[in-house]
Structures are given as C-alpha cells and as structure tokens.
Amino acid sequence: MLRQIIGQAKKHPSLIPLFVFIGTGATGATLYLLRLALFNPDVCWDRNNPEPWNKLGPNDQYKFYSVNVDYSKLKKERPDF
C-alpha cells in the first residue's frame, strides 16, 4: 500500500499535498478518538466503577477547549456521594 502511494507520488507530484492532508487528517482523527476513549468521563472501561463521572470535582476540566472559564477557581456546589 505504501509502495503504491510512493509510486503514484513519483509519477504525479501534484498528488503529494493530497496525501499529506489525508494523512494528517487521519492521524488527527485517530488521536482525537484516543483522547475521547481515555480521558472522557462518559466512557467507562472499568466495570467495578460504573459511574466514573462522580469522581470528578467541579474544578476538573474535561472539555476539549474552554474559552473563559478558570476551573481552578470554581467553588464546590454539590454534595459528596
């Protein structure tokens, strides 16, 4: 497969940017799915802990990007379970 891509790139050099962008997009999508699978509190890999989101405090940031919220200064407004 890689040999075909290199062969096509040698024959048609205008395809090189296309291969670069497709490879970058596939790598980014894979890394994003890996991030969601490992760090998202909605995903549960441990059957002994069926509700992992209860361990998160109000100052834990699990969003991908937050604009103006400083999570370290938030007060705790919910009870412990």
UniProtKB/Swiss-Prot annotation:
Mitochondrial intermembrane side: 38-81
One GO BP: mitochondrial electron transport, cytochrome c to oxygen
Transmembrane segment boundaries: 15-37
Keyword entries, A-Z: Acetylation, Electron transport, Leigh syndrome, Membrane, Mitochondrion, Mitochondrion inner membrane, Phosphoprotein, Primary mitochondrial disease, Respiratory chain, Transmembrane, Transmembrane helix, Transport
Mitochondrial matrix compartment residues: 1-14
Membrane topology: Single-pass membrane protein
One Gene Ontology molecular-function label: NADH dehydrogenase (ubiquinone) activity
Ribonucleoprotein keyword on record: no
GO CC annotations on file: mitochondrial inner membrane; mitochondrial membrane; mitochondrion; respiratory chain complex I; respiratory chain complex IV
Residues found modified as N6-acetyllysine: 10
Family under the similarity heading: Belongs to the complex IV NDUFA4 subunit family.
Function recorded in the entry: Component of the cytochrome c oxidase, the last enzyme in the mitochondrial electron transport chain which drives oxidative phosphorylation. The respiratory chain contains 3 multisubunit complexes succinate dehydrogenase (complex II, CII), ubiquinol-cytochrome c oxidoreductase (cytochrome b-c1 complex, complex III, CIII) and cytochrome c oxidase (complex IV, CIV), that cooperate to transfer electrons derived from NADH and succinate to molecular oxygen, creating an electrochemical gradient over the inner membrane that drives transmembrane transport and the ATP synthase.
Miscellaneous comment text of the record: During complex IV purifications dissociates from complex IV upon treatment with standard detergent DDM (decyl beta-D-maltoside) in high concentrations.
Clinical note on disease: Mitochondrial complex IV deficiency, nuclear type 21: An autosomal recessive mitochondrial disorder with onset in infancy. MC4DN21 is characterized by congenital lactic acidosis, encephalopathy, global developmental delay, delayed speech, motor dysfunction, dystonia, and spasticity. Ataxia, peripheral neuropathy, and seizures may also occur. Patient tissues show variably decreased levels and activity of mitochondrial respiratory complex IV.
Record-given protein name: Cytochrome c oxidase subunit NDUFA4
UniProt organism field: Homo sapiens (Human)
